Amino acid sequence: MSKGSSTKKWLHEHTSDYYVIQANKLGYRSRASFKILEIQDKYQLFKPNMFVVDLGASPGGWSEQVIKYIGKNGKLIALDLLEMAPIAGVEFIQGDFSSDETYQKLNTLVNNQKIDCVISDMAPNLSGNKTSDQAKSIYLLELALDFANTNLNKNGSFVAKVFQGQGSDEYLKLVRESFNKVIQFKPKSSRAKSREFYVIATEFKG
């Protein structure tokens, strides 16, 4: 299949996707909103007044939902390499999470406060080389976990997108070292063909 044909096929699948249609109908920023809504419905992670950090946030599908749960007295910092249109109540940092400069900006905003929940929908820019892409994905996941381990409240939570493949089982073992409860969850709104699942880790050991 040519590149043009595969692009047309993706566009057709995307525009006819139930969750894309629903997101447009409801005015959500992306179909990813449904994933975080499913996670919240099942695990009730987000509560009023919480402090949440959203990694890989653009275009804001998760942040726009989470801010509704934590309310005006909560705090939400969102970070992404790409631009994100403003969301009321959300502080946004544009930058590469793996760079020291961006990490420092995030730490400045965190300001030594303990975080209640770190959520990550980060994914690397895909090159088409599955081995390389998977390695980059695991690297970002390890950075997100390190950030959570450093900044979470005792009994805090961590949610991250994981792609099943080389290194994913080892990554889950690392998460289990830091949290008492670790669950693998694939939302209905994840595409059936996708290798993605979400790790839902609660009761941070601190």
Curated annotation (Swiss-Prot):
Protein's UniProt keywords contain Transmembrane helix: no
Binding site for S-adenosyl-L-methionine: G60, W62, D80, D96, D121
Family annotation (InterPro entries): RNA_methyltr_RlmE (IPR050082), RNA_MeTrfase_FtsJ_dom (IPR002877), rRNA-MeTfrase_E (IPR015507), SAM-dependent_MTases_sf (IPR029063)
Keywords of the record: Cytoplasm, Methyltransferase, rRNA processing, S-adenosyl-L-methionine, Transferase
Species this protein is from: Francisella tularensis subsp. holarctica (strain LVS)
Enzyme class: transferase
Reactions the enzyme catalyzes: uridine(2552) in 23S rRNA + S-adenosyl-L-methionine = 2'-O-methyluridine(2552) in 23S rRNA + S-adenosyl-L-homocysteine + H(+)
Annotated family: Belongs to the class I-like SAM-binding methyltransferase superfamily. RNA methyltransferase RlmE family.
Keyword hit for Translocase: no
Protein localization: Cytoplasm
Gene3D superfamilies, per database record: Vaccinia Virus protein VP39 (3.40.50.150)
Pfam entry (one): FtsJ
Record's function text: Specifically methylates the uridine in position 2552 of 23S rRNA at the 2'-O position of the ribose in the fully assembled 50S ribosomal subunit.
Entry protein name: Ribosomal RNA large subunit methyltransferase E
GO cellular component, one term: cytoplasm
SUPFAM superfamilies registered for this protein in UniProt: S-adenosyl-L-methionine-dependent methyltransferases
Single GO molecular function: rRNA (uridine-2'-O-)-methyltransferase activity
Entry EC no(s): 2.1.1.166
Active site: K161
